[in-house]
Amino acid sequence: MAGPAPGRRLVALALIVALAVGLPTAGAGQAPRPAERGPPVRLFTEEELARYGGEEEDQPIYMAVKGVVFDVTSGKEFYGRGAPYNALTGKDSTRGVAKMSLDPADLTHDTTGLTAEELESLDDVFTRVYKAKYPIVGYTARRILNEDGSPNLDFKPEDQPHFDIKDEF
């Protein structure tokens, strides 16, 4: 089986470099410093999150990874309108982050079929980039509620930003 196309590898490499830019440095064995706290968290439907895709100059830029909504406005040069990773914003892009992919088919919350390596990459980027660098502003409704509107029993209150987040899925 052939490896990924050279163009796709270049996009993945560029994504890794872009995500690593500005990472806080931590000593050996130290966890990255959590991002500064922002406004209180809220619940976002897919439609509400789509309003924060970087298209409006006066709006913050939000994206979700693993159902956690981050304010990535401080990375506007990467996530703003016309920026290289704008495709990740305004939605839960968990699969795209795991696969280091900007393919529209990968810009979804669905992690079905991801390899162990992709899941490990997802956890690493989630912790070392997003949780360390960007404020949590909310959660996707899909993470808190089931399709029928009933509570998602897998959601844990300790996932709230004022607690130390220890277990993400």
Swiss-Prot record:
Positions bearing N6-acetyllysine: K133
Source domain of life: Eukaryota
GO cellular component, one term: endomembrane system
SMART domains: Cyt-b5
Boundaries of every Cytochrome b5 heme-binding domain copy: 41-126
GO molecular function, one term: growth factor activity
Alphabetized UniProt keyword annotations: Acetylation, Endoplasmic reticulum, Heme, Iron, Metal-binding, Mitochondrion, Secreted, Signal
GO biological process, one term: MAPK cascade
Keyword S-adenosyl-L-methionine: no
Gene3D superfamilies with a match to the protein in the record: Cytochrome b5-like heme/steroid binding domain (3.10.120.10)
DNA damage listed as a keyword: no
Subcellular location(s) of the protein: Secreted, Extracellular space; Mitochondrion; Endoplasmic reticulum
Signal peptide residue numbers: 1-28
Family: Belongs to the cytochrome b5 family. MAPR subfamily.
Something else known: Non-classical progesterone receptors involved in extranuclear signaling are classified in 2 groups: the class II progestin and adipoQ receptor (PAQR) family (also called mPRs) (PAQR5, PAQR6, PAQR7, PAQR8 and PAQR9) and the b5-like heme/steroid-binding protein family (also called MAPRs) (PGRMC1, PGRMC2, NENF and CYB5D2).
Stated role: Acts as a neurotrophic factor in postnatal mature neurons enhancing neuronal survival. Promotes cell proliferation and neurogenesis in undifferentiated neural progenitor cells at the embryonic stage and inhibits differentiation of astrocytes. Its neurotrophic activity is exerted via MAPK1/ERK2, MAPK3/ERK1 and AKT1/AKT pathways. Neurotrophic activity is enhanced by binding to heme. Also acts as an anorexigenic neurotrophic factor that contributes to energy balance.
Complex and partners: Interacts with PINK1 and PARK7.
Name this protein carries in UniProt: Neudesin
Species assigned in the record: Bos taurus
Name of the coding gene: NENF
